[in-house]
C-alpha cells in the first residue's frame, strides 16, 4: 500500500473508534452509571496484506479513553468486531446479560453498523462494516476491531486467489467425473493421449503435450487449469465421436476434416489381441516342438487354430524373446574349449609298422583349436620335451623354444624295446597336464628313421603325441579325420600319402610362439641333428642362401633322404630364402628302406596360415609328401 492508502486506513480506523467511544458514552449516560464498568479495548489487527499501521497515535488515545471508561463502568456488555463479509444477522451475536442493558446494546449496535456512506464510497467490495456481538466472559472484556484491506477505486482489483469456494465441491466432482468419462471414451475411440494433444493443437492452435492430457485424466492439474481444459476436451471428444460415427459411412475425405486432422485418426492404436487359454496352450505346444516355424508352418497353425497368420507370427516372436529372458544362452562358446572325439577300433592303423602301439580300447582324442588336427595317423612324428640327442635311427630337431601354449597327444616312438605311450592334455592357457604312461614291448626293432621335433615348452608335459590315432582303422581317410576334427579336408589329398601317411597341421600362432623363436633365433641356432644307423650326422656346411647341408657320417650312400623346408617369415629364420635341412640315414638292417620325410613349404615373401608337417610311413614306398599351404 502507498502512504496515502495507509493514511486513509488510519483515518477510517480513527473514525470507527470515535463512533464506538461516543456510543458507549451515550449508553453509559442513559443508564446513569447504574451498571458496572466493562473492559472496552479496540485493537487494530494487521491487514490481510501484512502491512502494519505506521501511525496508530489516535487509536492509542481512544484506547486510553476506553480503558478509563472500563474502570468506571464494569458491568457493560462485551463488544466484538467481526469480519464484515460474514452474512449473519446482528441479533444472532447479541447475548444480553441484563434485561436493562439489551435495549442500549441494540442502540449502540445500530450506531456502529451505520457508518457514514461517504467513507465507504472510497472502498472496494467487500465494504467494511462493524458488527457488535456480546459474549458472557470474564470481567476482562475487549472489543477487537479488525480492519479490512481496502484500496481506492483508482487501484486495480487484486487477483483472485484460487481457493475453492462454497460452490466448488460440486465443480470438482463434475471435473472428476468428466476426466473419468473422457479417458474411457478416448480409449474406446482408439486415441492415445498424444493423439489428443496433437488434434487439439490443430483445432485451437495450441499443442498440448501428452503429459498434460495424462495429468488431466489423473486430476493432477490445478483447479484453474482443469477448468480451462475441460471445455476444449469436451468439444474435441464430441467432434471425435461424431467424426468416428460418420466416417464409417462417409468417404475417406472425412479423415481430412479439420475436426481432428489426418494424423488423429491415422494414428489410432491397434486393439490389443486377446488369445484364449486353449489356443495359448496349443501355441505353447507348437513352440516346444519348433521355436522357429517357417511361413508355411505358421500358415498351417493359423488355419488349425482359426487365427490370423500375423497374430501367430507375432506370438512366436514374442515367445522367443520371453524364452531368451527366462533361459539366457550361455556366454561361453565352443571356440575356447577342446574338441573331443572318440574313435574306437580294435585294429591297428598300419599293421606292417612295428613301431605303433595298438590298443583295443576307445581313446579320447583332444584337439585344441589353436592346434588343429587334419589327420589322425601320426606314425613317425613325436614331440617330446628332451633337449638331448636321441638314439640311433632318429633324425632329431632340438630347440629351446619358450613354453608352448598347447599340446598334442600321440604314441611316443623310440627304438627302445619298450614304447612309452604318453597322453598329455594341456589347455591353451596353461602348461599343467596329466600324464598317463603305459609300456608295451615292441615286436621288432625299428627299420627306418623317424623325425623328432623337440620343444622346451613341452618338457613339463613329458611327451606329446596323438595317441588316439593308433586306434583308427587302416582305411581311415584324411577327409574323414579332418571332418571329425572340424577342419577343411582339402588341405591335402589322401592320394598324396602312402599307406600310413599322416598330416599334422600346426597353426601359425603355435609355431610362432613355440618353435620359431628358438629354432632360428638371431643369437643362437637350434641344434639340428640328423641321426642314421651308424650315429649322428653333424652339420657340415651353411651356405650363403641359408641352406643347411648334412653329410652322411655312417658311410651310407643315401645323402638326401629327409629334407626339411621351412618358411623364413613364419618361423623367423635367418634369411628370406627357404632353409633346407638335408640329412642322410641308412636302414638299421643294412637295406635302403626309405626314411621319414618332414616338409613345410610356402612362399618366401608371405607368411602362411598353417605349417604342414608330413611324415611318410616307413613301410610304404619312398614318397616325398610335400604340402604347400595357402598363403595369406
From Swiss-Prot:
The keyword Transcription applies. Residues 243-258, 394-441 have a biased composition (Low complexity). GO terms for molecular function: chromatin binding; DNA binding; DNA-binding transcription factor activity, RNA polymerase II-specific; RNA polymerase II cis-regulatory region sequence-specific DNA binding; RNA polymerase II core promoter sequence-specific DNA binding; sequence-specific DNA binding; signaling receptor binding; transcription cis-regulatory region binding. GO terms for biological process: lens induction in camera-type eye; liver regeneration; negative regulation of DNA-templated transcription; negative regulation of miRNA transcription; olfactory placode formation; positive regulation of transcription by RNA polymerase II; regulation of transcription by RNA polymerase II; transcription by RNA polymerase II. Residues 243-273, 385-448 are annotated as: Disordered. Residues 167-241 form the POU-specific domain. The keyword Lipoprotein does not apply. InterPro entries: HD, Homeobox_CS, Homeodomain-like_sf, Lambda_DNA-bd_dom_sf, POU, POU2F1_C, POU_dom, POU_domain_TF. It is found in: Nucleus. GO terms for cellular component: nucleus; RNA polymerase II transcription regulator complex; transcription regulator complex. Phosphorylated by PRKDC. Pfam families: Homeodomain, Pou, POU2F1_C. Widely expressed. The modification Phosphoserine is found at residues 170, 274, 337. PROSITE patterns: HOMEOBOX_1, HOMEOBOX_2, POU_1, POU_2, POU_3. Interacts with POU2AF1; the interaction increases POU2F1 transactivation activity. Interacts with NR3C1, AR, PGR and HCFC1. Belongs to the POU transcription factor family. Class-2 subfamily. Transcription factor that binds to the octamer motif (5'-ATTTGCAT-3') and activates the promoters of the genes for some small nuclear RNAs (snRNA) and of genes such as those for histone H2B and immunoglobulins. Modulates transcription transactivation by NR3C1, AR and PGR. This is POU domain, class 2, transcription factor 1. It comes from Rattus norvegicus (Rat). The gene is Pou2f1.
Amino acid at each position: 500500500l502507498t502512504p496515502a492508502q495507509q493514511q486513509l486506513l488510519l483515518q477510517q480506523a480513527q473514525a470507527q473508534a470515535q463512533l464506538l467511544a461516543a456510543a458507549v458514552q451515550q449508553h453509559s449516560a442513559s443508564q446513569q452509571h447504574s451498571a458496572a464498568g466493562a473492559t472496552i479495548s479496540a485493537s487494530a489487527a494487521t491487514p490481510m496484506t501484512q502491512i502494519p499501521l505506521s501511525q496508530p497515535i489516535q487509536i492509542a488515545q481512544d484506547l486510553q479513553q476506553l480503558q478509563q471508561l472500563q474502570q468506571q463502568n464494569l458491568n457493560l456488555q462485551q463488544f466484538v468486531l467481526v469480519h464484515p463479509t460474514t452474512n449473519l444477522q446482528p441479533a444472532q451475536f447479541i447475548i444480553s446479560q441484563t434485561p436493562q442493558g439489551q435495549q442500549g446494546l441494540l442502540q449502540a449496535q445500530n450506531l456502529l453498523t451505520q457508518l457514514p456512506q461517504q467513507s465507504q464510497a472510497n472502498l472496494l467490495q467487500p465494504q467494511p462494516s462493524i458488527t457488535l456481538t456480546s459474549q458472557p466472559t470474564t470481567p476482562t472484556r475487549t472489543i477487537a476491531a479488525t480492519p479490512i484491506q481496502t484500496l481506492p477505486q483508482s487501484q486495480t482489483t487484486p487477483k483472485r486467489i484460487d481457493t475453492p469456494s462454497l460452490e466448488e465441491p460440486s465443480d470438482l466432482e463434475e471435473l472428476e467425473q468428466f476426466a473419468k468419462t473422457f479417458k474411457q471414451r478416448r480409449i474406446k475411440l482408439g486415441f492415445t493421449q498424444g493423439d489428443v494433444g496433437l488434434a487439439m493443437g490443430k483445432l485451437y492452435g495450441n499443442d498440448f503435450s501428452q503429459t498434460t492430457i495424462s495429468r488431466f485424466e489423473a486430476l493432477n492439474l490445478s483447479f484453474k487449469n482443469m477448468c480451462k481444459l475441460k471445455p476444449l476436451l469436451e468439444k474435441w471428444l464430441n467432434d471425435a465421436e461424431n467424426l468416428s460415427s460418420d466416417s464409417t459411412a462417409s468417404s475417406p475425405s472425412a479423415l481430412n476434416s479439420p475436426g481432428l486432422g489426418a494424423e488423429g485418426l491415422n494414428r489410432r492404436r491397434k486393439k490389443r489381441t486377446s488369445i484364449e487359454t486353449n489356443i495359448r496352450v496349443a501355441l505353447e505346444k507348437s513352440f516346444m516342438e519348433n521355436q522357429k516355424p517357417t511361413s508355411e508352418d505358421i500358415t498351417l497353425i493359423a488355419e488349425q487354430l482359426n487365427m490370423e497368420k500375423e497374430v501367430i507370427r507375432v506370438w512366436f516372436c514374442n515367445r522367443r524373446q520371453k524364452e531368451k529372458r527366462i533361459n539366457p544362452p550361455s556366454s561361453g562358446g565352443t571356440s575356447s574349449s577342446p574338441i573331443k572325439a572318440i574313435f574306437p577300433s580294435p585294429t591297428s592303423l598300419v599293421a606292417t609298422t612295428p613301431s605303433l602301439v595298438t590298443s583295443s580300447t576307445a581313446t579320447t582324442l583332444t584337439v585344441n583349436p589353436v592346434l588343429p588336427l587334419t589327420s589322425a595317423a601320426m606314425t613317425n612324428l613325436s614331440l617330446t620335451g628332451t633337449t638331448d640327442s636321441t638314439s640311433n635311427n632318429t633324425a632329431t630337431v632340438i630347440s629351446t623354444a619358450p613354453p608352448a601354449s598347447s599340446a598334442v597327444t600321440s604314441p611316443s616312438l623310440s627304438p627302445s624295446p619298450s614304447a612309452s605311450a604318453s597322453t598329455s592334455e594341456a589347455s591353451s592357457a596353461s602348461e599343467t597336464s596329466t600324464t598317463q604312461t603305459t609300456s608295451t614291448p615292441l615286436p621288432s626293432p625299428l627299420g627306418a628313421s623317424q623325425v623328432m621335433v623337440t620343444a622346451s615348452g613341452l618338457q613339463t608335459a613329458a611327451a606329446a603325441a596323438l595317441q588316439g590315432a593308433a586306434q583308427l582303422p587302416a582305411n581311415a581317410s584324411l577327409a574323414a579325420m579332418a571332418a571329425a576334427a572340424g577342419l577343411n579336408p582339402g588341405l591335402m589329398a589322401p592320394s598324396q600319402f602312402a599307406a600310413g601317411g599322416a598330416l599334422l597341421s600346426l597353426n601359425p600362432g603355435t609355431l610362432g610362439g613355440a618353435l620359431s623363436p628358438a629354432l632360428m633365433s638371431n643369437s643362437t641356432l637350434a641344434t639340428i641333428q640328423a641321426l642314421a644307423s651308424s650315429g649322428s650326422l653333424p652339420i657340415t656346411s651353411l651356405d650363403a642362401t641359408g641352406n643347411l647341408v648334412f653329410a652322411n657320417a655312417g658311410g651310407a650312400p643315401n645323402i638326401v633322404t629327409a629334407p626339411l623346408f621351412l618358411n623364413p617369415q613364419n618361423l623367423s629364420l635367418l634369411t628370406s630364402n627357404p632353409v633346407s635341412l638335408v640329412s642322410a640315414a641308412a636302414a638299421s638292417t643294412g637295406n635302403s628302406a626309405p626314411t621319414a620325410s618332414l616338409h613345410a613349404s610356402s612362399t618366401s615373401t608371405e607368411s602362411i596360415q598353417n605349417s604342414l608337417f608330413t611324415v611318410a610311413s616307413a613301410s610304404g614306398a619312398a614318397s616325398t609328401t610335400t604340402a604347400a599351404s595357402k598363403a595369406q
